[in-house]
Structure formats: C-alpha cells, structure tokens
Amino acid sequence: MSRLVKKPIPYPENVKVSYDEKEHKVTVEGPKGKLELNIHPDIKVTLNQQERWIKLDRPSDRSFHKAIHGTMAALIKNMIKGVTEGFTEILEIHGLGYRAQLKGNVLELHLGKSHPDIYPIPPDVKIEVKGNEIHIHGIDKQRVGQVAAEIRSFRKPDPYKGKGIRYKGEQLSSNPERLQVRSKEVR
C-alpha cells in the first residue's frame, strides 16, 4: 500500500476537493453528492487545485504511520469514485417463497418466517428490487456495504440447502462441519 500512496491522487474535472487544515477534514463534492472525511492529524495533506491532485505525506516510516497513510489514501480514492460513479452491491434471494418488496421507504423481506422482516431504508442509500435481486446504490462505499450486510443478516445463506440471502457471485462451502472434522483428522 505504501508504494501506491507515494503518487498524488488525481481527481476529474467535475469533482471539487477542499481541505480544512483546522479540522483536518477533506471534502469531496461531485455530480452524485458530497462526502467528508476526517484525516488523522499526523498525515499532511497537499492539495493542488490547478493540476487537480491531492497528496498525503506521513511524518515517519513507523508501521502505524504507514498503515494510516495507506488507509486515508484508499478512503479518499473511494470518495472520489463514489461522487463520480457511485457504488452498487447486489444481493440474491434464494429459497422457495422468499421474496423482497419495497413499500415506500421500507424494504419488506418474506424469508420463510411467520412475519415479514422490515428494514427501513437509510436516506443516503437507494434500494431497488428486481426479481430475486436487491440492488443497493450509494456514494459511500462503507455505507453501501453496511446496508448490504444488515439485509443479508436477516437470513444468512444455509450451506446445506442454499436458501437465504447472499451476495451476487458468493460461493457457499458445501459442508463446513465435515471440512472442520477432516482438517482435525489430518493434524
């Protein structure tokens, strides 16, 4: 990660980046919205508005400073991508009679229980239901992932029958208990 942050982070013409030195806060504003990030006080931020790049510098090569340097750079890159393109997470619903539907600003999930699970949709995230898929859109990568994880937690995928809510393309291990038993026998 440290080699990636040696270069300045470029941003496109339609994105406005500003830095408040007193509050150590980077603000990224683009066509899809506005995001803010509190920068660690040890990290020095250099912003060049004419050449359209932002550079982060760390005070030392201690492992903590290297880690926080790479983390801050990755978060800023994700903010720039979020306000220009946005992020999408897709969940699939598998199971007989399992379905999801939108009712206003609430996602209603029928997942084989005696009652539907209700999930209030946060204002900074947009959710669409297409057949057996739930599409989650937003500009904040962390928020989109968090909402997807919360929806998935209503009915995690069953490794034996394959029923439940899973990420698109997620592979389930066929029999986790057997795999654990076999690994103990090998030792």
Swiss-Prot record:
GO terms for biological process: cytoplasmic translation. PROSITE patterns: RIBOSOMAL_L6_1 (PS00525). The lineage of its organism: Bacteria, Pseudomonadati, Aquificota, Aquificia, Aquificales. Pfam families: Ribosomal_L6. The gene is rplF. Residues 159-187 are annotated as: Disordered. HAMAP family: Ribosomal_uL6_B. GO terms for cellular component: cytosolic large ribosomal subunit. This is Large ribosomal subunit protein uL6. Keywords: Ribonucleoprotein, Ribosomal protein, RNA-binding, rRNA-binding. It comes from the Bacteria. GO terms for molecular function: rRNA binding; structural constituent of ribosome. Part of the 50S ribosomal subunit. Gene3D superfamilies: Ribosomal protein L6, alpha-beta domain. Belongs to the universal ribosomal protein uL6 family. This protein binds to the 23S rRNA, and is important in its secondary structure. It is located near the subunit interface in the base of the L7/L12 stalk, and near the tRNA binding site of the peptidyltransferase center.
